[in-house]
Amino acid sequence: KDNNLIKDYKASAAEAMKKDDGNFFTKYGNFFLKGIQNTILISIVGVLLGTVFGAGIALLKLSKIKLLSWLASAYIEFLRGTPLLVQVFLVYFGTTAVLGLNISALICGMIALVINCSAYIAEIIRAGINAVDSGQTEAARSLGLTYGQTMKSVILPQAIKNILPALGNEFVTVIKESSIVSVIGVSEIMFNAQVVQGASFDPFTPLIVAAILYFILTFTLSRVMYYFEGRMKVSD
């Protein structure tokens, strides 16, 4: 299925090459637009779901139950200690070749990014929770709040505020790292740049366009994060 998709992309790019208007962006602009859409989609899914799973893993690591804490630590250390490229291949070939599931390359790429993000975000959240004064936990417990209520009403709201800049940086990192999923045929920016390279016989221009697009996405996101950081400081 994915191989057919790749052939379709290459056929479309070759067809675009036959256009005689001589304008690179008129010929291949749609490929880069499609790449931008998928890059943004993959990154958003990776960060959002990674945050959800990462929060759970962070709480497990902070658990007083040693087995749960050890398992969470092992999960985090393994994913942080192995390349994302290897993780992408493990998910892709593990789901398709080993388990025999018919899952698209796009979904496999998303799963790999979510798993990878969850490990890094778990550490961010854990650090944010530990940064909250322990006296607040003791005060909340003395008022009769349970551990769960203390986390929900006292600790996490402060921790989230503390970790927002780090989460923004993780989002920027994921946008750049999403290029790795091109190796399994996901049509994000880098994959489509390679398709255009093959169709146009121009090895340089598509890479320059891809680099500019990644820069625009990451720079825009960074500016947005700086804006919200400034608003948060004013509110304090």
Roles of regions detected by a PLM:
Residues 2-236:
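Transmembrane alpha-helices and adjacent helix-loop boundaries
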